[in-house]
Amino acid sequence: MKRSKHDPLEIPSYQLVDAARYLHVPYQTLHSWTTGASPSKAVIKIASLKPPTLSFMDLVECWVLAGLRHRERISMPKVRSAVDTLRLKYNSRHPLAEKEFETDGIDLFIREAMVLVNVSRSAQFVIRDVVEAHLRRIERDDTGLACRLFPFTTSAQSKSKVDAPKIIVIDPLISFGRPVLRGTAICTSVLASRHRGGDSIPSLAREYGRKQIEIKQAIEWERAAA
């Protein structure tokens, strides 16, 4: 689906260093995915190259890609080929963010990316499970467009991610797309900064009218992203 460059979902909003933090992906990895050795070799076609800046839709695609490459070191050329196949199939600039990817797209990606790669069938099931967990953190509007992303909080790292609580949200229409506590415009970076400055979790919870566990998770998430 083609959208206007002025669409909030398509506006360049996240520089690489910030996007890497939000996705908990190494900077060099994200750089490889989005710019590569040259723009033509990039897996994700980002909104702006000078400087490299991602739109919300780009961010969502990188989130899905992080799930796809979570367990198996699939070569980048094969990943790029698989994404290009999906791009043609869906006639979309952002195939990994499309609603259709949640149905037949995952299996197609795995088939395309793993041709001639020695990955067991059981490993493919694991990859599918990880990707589905990532996809469930994407909220869509009535038309199927990705509109919010709920990154995994620290508590979700050691538990099943499928039903992990959605405490932090990235919404392009709230706080300029910066991570906030769900249901608020309270930036997680502000909470982390104030905590570093000496404010306790209980005092922050009282001031903002939120549960202590939410404040704690936001601070720990920011710490892990640093």
Roles of regions detected by a PLM:
Residues 1-6, 165-186:
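Short, Lys/Arg-enriched anionic-surface-contact patches
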Residues 5-30:
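Polyanion-binding surface elements
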Residues 21-25, 36, 206-211:
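A short, basic/aromatic helix-end/turn motif that makes direct DNA contacts
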Residues 26-48:
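Major-groove DNA-recognition helix of helix-turn-helix-type DNA-binding domains
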Residues 41-66:
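Short helix-start
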Residues 74-142:
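Charged mid-protein connector segments
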Residues 130-176:
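Basic, low-complexity segments
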Residues 184-226:
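Long, charge-rich, low-complexity alpha-helical segments
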